[in-house]
């Protein structure tokens, strides 16, 4: 049925293997009967390494020309476009290499989409795909066309039947105002979809989690043709009662156990299920797919899970999040908690713009459109660049307010002493931002009786107001964390060059530069701009330093000399970077940055 696209499969597999092993996402689902809000709650951490910049857009509903085709990844299949597409909120993972498997959506009908990579399937189960297969198109087309979660499943599985999935595997969480589903896709055209029950809580890291799937539940379960039969034939599933497929263990039949046992998955599963059930699971096979909890969960409970660190975090001599075994991880670049509502306009989101254990969840009404300042590209330009990004689009821009959140997170990663104090301030800010949400919804619902447009405009104004307040607080926090000025004494840095580059740390009333410890000084990218393989100790070390007055203010400064390629080896050529200097004076950490074009 399918002709193989080796290139697309190889590229996708390599990318996911790296991402899963060090980075990886987390998703929590709370059924409406066990939710403090009385509605479904979905929490999600999005993890991707490198120079990732998360933007938020509203894409308007559109009418398309007859015969229009859409193509996302260069090697993926061309797909006929629908005549009409819905408007949708788009939280974009903007990556230099293109992000096929990261973006989140809430469309005007309330269909909400997040996903988790579930790679490393059994090699013998890989299938051929047609015309390059489909990857990013699954999520984007569901967002554009689906009016319900069930319809989204139908759209996705029709695409799988026609083209096949070119990545190893993934679990999509798809909600609407009435129900929430998970669609686990295996490379090619194998999949299982299950409706999350109203009294369940689900957690998933980066392995398939569905077990004990009742395939006879025609209302709540769907499977691809031949999925169960193949598992039985291969000896990977034996029904408890022959011929009765009420206990199908999808995760065991279609993914090696080593992925569940891998520490980056095992540790997150253990942390999350401990917080959900109060029980410590010590075996990967013990982890449930879902539980019926003995208590209700609210937004704050979900936040606590998504913010959870591991015991390996916060060790001296490392970035705070170095190992990546917690739920809030080195490469968590955004986190969101969605509270569903019968009216899509009133769906609430609580969203971070950097690592959730270091920055605030900012209240947002996604269908009311995000603040314009949360993006630096228009939605159509962002779409064009999603798989064809320009290096200059990844410039550090001090005028883009989202950098205040990223800068604060980067500083905290080095200044461990400030971690707890920062979180107290973050929680205080969240309390202030969130205390008016109930009243805002009450007002919006009254406005909607008169004019839905006026209700939308009013909620949008609240999106802008809350984002602005949060940004101001983060900028103030960063200025306190990083009070000392850093200058890169060059316009550009050659990422392959052996020449010297100098970086100055300016002295001031509180910093006597002769007290700076050369042995504790390194330079390079910020924590949020690199993957899990880059550590604090792998950054550039100075070959020498000199004390002198750089800016002519009569105060001594210190100038460090580095080799250019050592500083820029983990940076993107063609972009202006925030080049970080990490040091200490009298055992007090110093973190700051200057800027330079990377060549």
List where the protein language model places each region.
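A contiguous strand-loop segment
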Residues: 25-135, 155-294
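Bacterial N-terminal signal peptides that target proteins for export
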Residues: 1-9
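Boundary/junction segments of secreted and surface-exposed precursor proteins
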Residues: 24, 483-508
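A short beta-turn/strand-edge loop motif at beta-sheet boundaries
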Residues: 496, 509-517, 570-571
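Acidic, glycine-anchored loop motifs typical of Ca2+
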Residues: 495-496, 529, 543-569
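Long, well-ordered mid-to-C-terminal structural blocks that present hydrophobic/aromatic surfaces
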Residues: 285-381
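Charged low-complexity "KEKE/polyampholyte" interaction tracts
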Residues: 354-358, 364-482
């Amino acid at each position: 049925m399918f002709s193989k696209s080796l290139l697309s499969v190889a590229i996708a597999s390599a990318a996911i293997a790296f991402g899963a092993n060090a980075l990886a996402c987390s998703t929590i689902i709370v059924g409406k009967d066990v939710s403090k809000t009385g509605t479904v709650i979905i929490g999600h951490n999005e993890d991707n390494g490198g120079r990732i910049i998360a933007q938020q857009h509203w894409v308007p509903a559109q009418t398309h020309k007859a015969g229009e085709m859409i193509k996302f990844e260069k090697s993926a299949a061309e797909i006929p476009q629908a005549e009409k597409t819905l408007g949708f909120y788009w939280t974009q993972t903007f990556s230099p290499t293109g992000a096929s498997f990261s973006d989140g959506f809430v469309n005007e009908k309330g269909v909400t989409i997040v996903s988790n990579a579930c790679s490393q399937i059994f090699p013998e189960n890989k299938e051929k795909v047609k015309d390059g297969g489909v990857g990013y198109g699954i999520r984007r087309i569901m967002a554009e066309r689906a009016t319900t979660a069930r319809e989204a499943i139908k759209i996705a599985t029709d695409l799988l039947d026609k083209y096949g999935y070119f990545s190893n595997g993934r679990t999509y969480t798809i909600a609407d105002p009435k129900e929430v589903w998970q669609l686990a896709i295996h490379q090619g055209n194998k999949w299982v979809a299950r409706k999350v029950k109203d009294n369940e809580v689900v957690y998933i890291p980066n392995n398939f989690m569905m077990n004990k799937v009742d395939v006879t539940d025609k209302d709540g379960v769907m499977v691809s043709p031949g999925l169960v039969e193949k598992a039985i034939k291969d000896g990977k599933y034996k029904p408890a009662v022959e011929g009765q497929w009420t206990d199908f263990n999808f995760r065991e039949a279609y993914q090696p156990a080593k992925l569940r046992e891998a520490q980056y998955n095992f540790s997150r599963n253990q942390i999350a299920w401990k917080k959900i059930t109060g029980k410590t699971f010590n075996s990967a096979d013990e982890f449930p797919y879902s539980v019926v909890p003995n208590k209700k969960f609210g937004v704050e409970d979900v936040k606590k899970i998504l913010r959870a660190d591991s015991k390996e975090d916060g060790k001296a001599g490392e970035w705070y999040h170095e190992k990546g075994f917690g739920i809030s991880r080195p490469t968590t670049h955004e986190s969101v908690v969605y509270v569903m509502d019968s009216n899509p306009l009133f769906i609430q989101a609580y969203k971070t713009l950097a690592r959730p254990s270091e920055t605030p969840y900012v209240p947002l009404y996604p269908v009311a459109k995000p603040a314009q300042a949360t993006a630096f590209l228009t939605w159509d330009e962002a779409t064009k660049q999603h798989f064809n990004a320009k290096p200059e689009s990844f410039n550090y821009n001090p005028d883009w307010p989202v950098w205040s959140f990223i800068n604060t997170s980067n500083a905290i990663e080095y200044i461990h002493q400030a971690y707890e104090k920062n979180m107290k301030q973050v929680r205080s800010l969240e309390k202030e931002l969130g205390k008016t949400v109930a009243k805002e919804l009450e007002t919006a619902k009254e406005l909607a009786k008169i004019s839905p447009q006026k209700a939308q405009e009013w909620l949008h104004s609240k999106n802008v107001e809350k984002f602005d307040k949060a940004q101001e607080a983060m900028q103030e926090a960063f200025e306190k964390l990083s009070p000392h000025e850093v200058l890169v004494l060059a316009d550009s840095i050659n990422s392959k060059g052996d020449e010297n580059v100098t970086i100055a740390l300016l002295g001031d009333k509180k910093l006597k530069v002769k007290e700076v410890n050369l042995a504790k000084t390194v330079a390079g990218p910020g924590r949020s701009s690199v993957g899990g393989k880059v550590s604090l100790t792998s950054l550039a070390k100075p070959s020498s330093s000199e004390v002198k007055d750089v800016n002519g203010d009569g105060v001594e400064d210190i100038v460090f000399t580095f080799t250019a390629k050592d500083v820029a080896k983990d940076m993107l050529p063609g972009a202006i970077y925030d080049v970080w200097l990490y040091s200490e004076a009298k055992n007090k950490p110093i973190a700051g940055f200057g800027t330079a074009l990377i060549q």
